[in-house]
Amino acid sequence: MEVILLEKVANLGSLGDKVKVKAGYGRNFLLPYGKAVPATEANVKAFEERRAELEKAAAEKLAAAQARAEALEGASFTITSKAGEEGKLFGSIGVRDIADAVSTGGTEVEKSEVRLPEGPIRVTGEYDIELQLHTDVEVTIKLAVVAE
């Protein structure tokens, strides 16, 4: 299946690229989320007419993400949770908890933007958490998990 990308998609291409993808990926992800349109002649013409508008919107998204990254650069946050004697948490700290803690600090962060490659946090301590605010914008924050 050939599609035209309407925005930058990680590991696939950027705005305006005509790429070949598997039918399921196109039908179930790219098309429903508005990230691409099928590469028919009519869609190619329509895309070329809207290209400047789409590029402007993409530039605005990137600028907004960079502004959020500057606000978060070097920031540190603290989450308190119940823990046992050796610092092991009763439960865990997940992406939603981290997103809520950062959002209460004044900069809105979605839970899908928080990256925890090693899974949820289950022990007290200090952690470097990576936030991917845009496909091109990443920022690292410090998170301290302390016992109540």
Curated annotation (Swiss-Prot):
Swiss-Prot/TrEMBL GO biological process terms: translation
GO molecular function, one term: rRNA binding
InterPro entries in the record: Ribosomal_bL9, Ribosomal_bL9/RNase_H1_N, Ribosomal_bL9_bac/chp, Ribosomal_bL9_C, Ribosomal_bL9_C_sf, Ribosomal_bL9_N, Ribosomal_bL9_N_sf
SUPFAM superfamilies the UniProt entry points to: L9 N-domain-like (SSF55658), Ribosomal protein L9 C-domain (SSF55653)
Domain of life: Bacteria
Family from the record: Belongs to the bacterial ribosomal protein bL9 family.
Biological role: Binds to the 23S rRNA.
UniProt name for this protein: Large ribosomal subunit protein bL9
Originating species: Marinobacter nauticus (strain ATCC 700491 / DSM 11845 / VT8)
Classification of source organism: Bacteria, Pseudomonadati, Pseudomonadota, Gammaproteobacteria, Pseudomonadales
